[in-house]
């Protein structure tokens, strides 16, 4: 059964396809229309603006804090009763260098503030911070899927792996459309969305 959506789709496969198509198109617009430049850097408000833009045509909850508890495998994301406080703490975390930025990213992943679309929106948010603070972005096409997922799974206990992995993929091509579009495709690939190429939408 598909997650409740604005498209009236009841098949999970149909929803996944449309969600990928529509939100990848919106992700491209974030870059092409320079909309990211208008969003807060490194705050939940900035992340919510990204999430809202990506998913507003698909889900009523776009940009809004989830109202259910979430888990993936054996890992439980921040419980609802602590979520607001967690997000306020993340806003206050420093972002002055690479290590601090990744630590902030790891905490936002643990918070997992949205019902759906956390990973995809938070990777854009991470690049937005890196670009503004240290003049770099991650070239996600250089980050192996299995390595990334394993490093993120371990990151709440030990964040050294995700730091090493992302540091090795940093590029100073912060205004490259190709790096951004390939990055969106790779980001979606981590989550199993591979039907559409962002540049072709």
Feature annotation, model-predicted:
Residues 1-201:
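FIC/Doc superfamily catalytic core
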């Amino acid at each position: 059964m598909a997650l409740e959506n604005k498209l009236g789709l009841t098949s999970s496969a149909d929803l996944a396809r449309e969600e990928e198509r529509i939100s990848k198109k919106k992700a491209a617009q974030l870059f092409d229309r320079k909309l990211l430049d208008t969003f807060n850097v490194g705050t939940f408000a900035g992340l919510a603006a990204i999430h809202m833009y990506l998913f507003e045509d698909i889900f009523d909850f776009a940009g809004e804090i989830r109202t259910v508890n979430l888990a993936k495998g054996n890992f439980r994301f921040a419980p609802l009763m602590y979520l607001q406080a967690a997000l306020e703490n993340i806003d206050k975390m420093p972002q002055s260098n690479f290590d601090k930025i990744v630590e902030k990213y790891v905490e936002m992943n643990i918070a997992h503030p949205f019902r759906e679309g956390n990973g995809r929106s938070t990777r854009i948010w991470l690049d937005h911070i890196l670009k503004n603070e240290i003049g770099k972005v991650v070239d996600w096409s250089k980050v192996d899927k299995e390595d990334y997922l394993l490093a993120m799974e371990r990151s709440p206990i030990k964040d050294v792996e995700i730091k090493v992995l992302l540091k090795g993929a940093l590029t100073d091509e912060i205004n490259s459309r190709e790096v951004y579009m390939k990055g969106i495709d790779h980001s979606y690939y981590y989550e199993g969305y591979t039907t559409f190429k962002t540049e072709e939408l």
